[in-house]
Amino acid sequence: MAVDEMQLAASMQMSNQMSNSQRMSFAIHEILGIQGNAYLSHGYCPQGTFLSNQPNFMDIGSCGVSGFDRQLCGTDSIGNAPAPLMYRMPISTSEVITSEPQTHVSSSSILSSATTSNSSGGGSSGGGGKASKRKKRRHRTIFTQYQIDELEKAFQDSHYPDIYAREVLAGKTELQEDRIQVWFQNRRAKWRKTEKTWGKSTIMAEYGLYGAMVRHSLPLPETITKSAEAADPQQSAAPWLLGMHKKSMEAAAHLESVEKCDMSDSDDDDRPVTPPVQRQVKNEYKPRIIEHVQQQAPQHQSSLNFDTSLVVSSSLSQLHFQDSQMIPNNNASLKLYHDYNNPM
């Protein structure tokens, strides 16, 4: 029996030594040869590390040691821990389980507070969006073509109209004076932009080269007009300008031909045109008119004969009176003639 007890004690001692050697062989400070940590030399974690106020007591940073020594805070170190530390540890797993819902409640409360803060922030941001939407929109005026034409005419006369000119325009266009002022500001900005793009030639900016030449009645260069006779307009120096020139010439020729046709039609319209119905009526009345004239002819003839007899008698009497006056004169002239022929 004594031998058995001795063998049992020896085996237990060997198992304890083996367990101690196995425990120490797994220690990181034994593997790395670190002996400076006072807590690791005793084989337990400092007091209060497992009952920290962190949400999760198994967190990496809950132990008082460094992060890679957290494996040392296991069952072995807890078993070797002194009595004060054991008193601070939870007695059963139920206490640990009961402590976990509190952490969940706290986290849920945190989430609820975060959601309420987000909702309040969202409401404030939404209120800001509504406030921005409630801002007064700028009044935009839609101009008619007549109003634009009148404003353009005034802009050609003056880029900076005075208050009197703006009031006159307001009466013509039925616009407010401030709207007219804003339109002129925008139009001046547009004009400056086009002037900056095209230079000082605002005519070029508004109408282009061909429009400027037509507006000022400038002749096209000979290089372009000579190339107009060519079959291919692309061979000219400015094919687009030549194309516009040809189109304008064709339009002018067509307009001239139309005007000539209108003039000839107007001349024909001036002549009286008898419709065929009137011609038939005239042809029907012609024999009746001839008969009426023939019936009235003797009366007219008698009256004409009476008138002619009176005229003839009066003319004969006048001739006789003249002859009676001319006879003495003829004798006197004959007497003078004889005296001239017979001188003394």
Swiss-Prot record:
Could you state a single Gene Ontology molecular function term? DNA-binding transcription factor activity, RNA polymerase II-specific
Q: In which tissues is it expressed?
A: Expressed in several neurons including AIY, CEPDL, RID, ALA, RMED, AIN, AVJ and CAN neurons.
Q: Which PROSITE patterns match?
A: CVC (PS51496), HOMEOBOX_1 (PS00027), HOMEOBOX_2 (PS50071)
Question: Compositionally biased, Low complexity: which spans?
Answer: 106-119
A GO BP term here is: regulation of transcription by RNA polymerase II
* Source species, domain of life: Eukaryota
What the protein does comes down to: Transcription factor. Binds to a sequence motif, 5'-TTATTGGCTTCGTTAA-3', which may be involved in AIY interneuron function, in the regulatory elements of target genes; binding is more efficient, in vitro, together with LIM/homeobox protein ttx-3. Required for larval development and for cell fate specification and migration of CAN neurons. Required for generation, or placement, and differentiation of the ALA neuron, and may play a role in ALA axon migration. Involved in development and function of the AIY interneurons, acting by regulating expression of LIM/homeobox protein ttx-3.
Residue ranges annotated as compositionally biased, kind Gly residues, are 120-130
Q: Where is this region: Disordered?
A: 97-139, 260-279
Query: A single Pfam family, by name?
Result: Homeodomain
Keywords assigned by UniProt? Developmental protein, DNA-binding, Homeobox, Neurogenesis, Nucleus, Transcription, Transcription regulation
Can you name the source organism?
Caenorhabditis elegans
Query: DNA-binding region located at which positions?
Result: 136-195
Q: Where is the CVC domain?
A: 196-250
Q: An example Gene Ontology cellular component term from the record?
A: nucleus
Cite the Gene3D superfamilies for this sequence.
Homeodomain-like (1.10.10.60)
Instruction: Supply the name of the protein.
Output: Homeobox protein ceh-10
> What is stated as this protein's family in its record?
Belongs to the paired homeobox family.
Q: Where in the cell is it found?
A: Nucleus
Following inactivation of the gene, the phenotype reported is: RNAi-mediated knockdown causes severe defects in the ALA neuron in young adults, and when RNAi is begun embryonically, some individuals lack a detectable ALA neuron.
- Report if keyword Endoplasmic reticulum is assigned: no
Instruction: Give yes or no: UniProt keyword DNA-binding.
Output: yes
